[in-house]
Amino acid sequence: MKLETHNIAVGAGLISLDVLIWDWQRVPISYYVGGTCGNVMMILSYMGWDAYPIARLDGTKDGMRVLDDMKKHHVHIDFVSTQDGKTPVIVQRNFINKDGLPTHKFESRNNIGRFYLDFKSLTLKQANGVIERIDFVPKVFFFDRVSPAILKLATTFKEKGSVVFFEPSSRGGN
């Protein structure tokens, strides 16, 4: 395994498609990579890092929009699968509140009651496949969701000398 001297980050967790809508238009005005992990990978790439998300998306139009946005912003998609995952969608509805100020709200269901936020974590088999294929040691491993596969990645990268950064997805009792 070769050691890299430049900044490389690997991330796992919530990578979604953010759909922004102005309330009075009722049609999407933009589609961007979102989710905590997705945002971190995009920001680090913008700052000159090599960013490698590890994710299970799907091959739908939403999944392809996520991949296209990542590629457009030089995020490496080597470890993003579109075979058996789901692409979470987060809808942000922008509007002017009663005081005349711009604000927004997030929606978790579509107009027929289906949840947008379908997230599928990596499997242990997929994590082991990434560990076998990866030929560098990242400076940072970032994650925002906990699963056996993501913990396996965190442990492996820590043992190789990476800084492991966990940002919990919510403040819960556990």
Regions found by a protein language model. Give the residues of each.
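Conserved N-terminal subdomain of the carbohydrate kinase-like
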Residues: 17-21, 25-26, 49-140
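Alpha-helix C-terminal capping segments
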Residues: 41-50
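Flexible, charged surface loops at secondary-structure boundaries
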Residues: 2-5, 46, 130-138, 158-159
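Short catalytic helix/loop segments, enriched in acidic residues and glycine
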Residues: 24-42
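Positively charged, low-complexity intrinsically disordered leader regions
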Residues: 1-25
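Conserved beta-alpha-beta core of the PfkB/ribokinase-like small-molecule kinase fold
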Residues: 138-174
